[in-house]
Amino acid sequence: MNLSGDRTTLKRHSSLSTLVAHFFGILAVVLMLIWLLHYREGIEYGSDNPLKVLNVHPFLMYCGFLFLVGQAMMTYKTAYASHQVQKMVHGGLHLIGLVLGIVGICAAFRFHDKVNLKDMVSLHSWIGLTTFILLGVQWLFGAFTFLAPQSSSGTRTRMMPWHVLGGRALLYMGIVAALTGLMQRATMLGQSTNAESRLINFLGLAILLFGVSVDFSVALGRYN
């Protein structure tokens, strides 16, 4: 059995998965911007137009939160840098994503206030907020376990598998939240144009394939 050859093949597959993830991730950002800026009213948190405020939510929850979380996961496993640099970039990208996610969630609540809608009544909102809170807990857990100098190497070794599995599970929960959010928004729009409907479908597929590619990259990245 050629272990060296197997490792080389897995490293190549990991690099390919990372490139594919970047492609679908950036494609989803572009499609999101086309949708919100061309077909919808635009993006503005402080606008008097409630629909512009609402558009901040999907923009920041994907482009600012989910996309950065995926990048953070791949950075830790696939970036060619020292382990300490990988950890700092991993934690930093997660933190930026969480901050932008808070703004995105506030935009949804702000929209509800403007149009007198109740908060937290949809499956999307339940999945989304649960995922966001758990990811915040995951970040705090990781900071105290893997970045704090007083944490022992034994503790880090024991906790690492759970941290990795939790991160991968939360990535998929975030993908589910994004897709249910797109479905909910499409339902709100009613009879939109065929071109817009197709764009939303392609956006959902790009987000899904981004998440799958990130997971493949992370799963194979341990062989780098």
Curated annotation (Swiss-Prot):
Signal peptide: none
InterPro entries: CYB561/CYBRD1-like, Cyt_b561/ferric_Rdtase_TM
Record lineage: Eukaryota, Viridiplantae, Streptophyta, Embryophyta, Tracheophyta
Localization, UniProt: Membrane
Gene that encodes the chain: CYB561C
Class of the enzyme per the UniProt entry, highest EC level: translocase
Cofactor notes: Binds 2 heme b groups non-covalently.
Membrane disposition: Multi-pass membrane protein
Species of origin: Arabidopsis thaliana (Mouse-ear cress)
Transmembrane regions: 19-39, 53-73, 89-109, 127-147, 162-182, 199-219
Protein name in the entry: Probable transmembrane ascorbate ferrireductase 3
A molecular function GO annotation: transmembrane ascorbate ferrireductase activity
